[in-house]
């Protein structure tokens, strides 16, 4: 369940209350106990809690649809500029939490925002589409597209500015999202080797 947490590699972890505090996942643990386990097992010092996930997200609010570290001290976050959108309040709340958050080095976060794509539906459920759900391989970026030329292009331009030294590949992710996930969800990152000298 790699999308339930995101780490910066420098002691800070980000997750959501909806996901890790959900009774389906951790029925016997409260927030303090979960934080203790994350600190012990992942060697993190600071935990940033976002609130809820996207509307109809089958993952119970995985953070990899909402925000991700792009480097220590910097986060990319999904937003909606439409107050009538069902995700607007959730995304505004998460953005506010990020604005007040500090990383493990007590720095305020640099926040790069990306507008969510146009809403799409599968029967009566909204698809949890997010440009934040991308994969970061060596020297590259595999990011989603949603057959929404305006937002797809805007997102790509932001990624090109944020990651100028990486080759960016934008893939149509609509079928992946219909299955209940995104590009980040169907990949598994290989951590950088830690060598003890």
Regions found by a protein language model. Name each.
Residues 1-197:
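The feature marks the mature, well-folded catalytic cores of soluble enzymes
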């Amino acid at each position: 369940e790699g999308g339930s947490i995101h780490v910066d590699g420098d002691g800070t972890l980000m997750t959501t209350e909806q996901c890790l505090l959900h009774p389906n996942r951790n029925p016997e643990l409260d927030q303090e106990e979960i934080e203790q386990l994350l600190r012990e097992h992942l060697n993190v010092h600071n935990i940033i809690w976002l609130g809820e996930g996207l509307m109809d997200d089958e993952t119970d609010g995985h953070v990899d649809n909402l925000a991700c570290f792009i480097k220590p001290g910097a986060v990319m976050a999904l937003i909606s500029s439409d107050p009538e959108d069902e995700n607007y309040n959730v995304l505004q709340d998460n953005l506010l939490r990020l604005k007040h958050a500090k990383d493990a080095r007590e720095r305020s976060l640099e926040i790069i925002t990306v507008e969510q794509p146009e809403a799409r539906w599968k029967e009566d459920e909204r698809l949890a589409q997010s440009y934040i759900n991308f994969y970061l391989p060596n020297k590259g970026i595999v990011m989603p597209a949603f057959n929404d030329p305006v937002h797809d292009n805007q997102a790509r331009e932001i990624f090109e500015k944020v990651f100028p030294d990486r080759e960016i590949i934008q893939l149509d992710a609509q079928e992946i999202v219909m299955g209940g996930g995104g590009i980040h969800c169907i990949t598994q990152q290989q951590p950088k080797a830690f060598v003890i000298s």
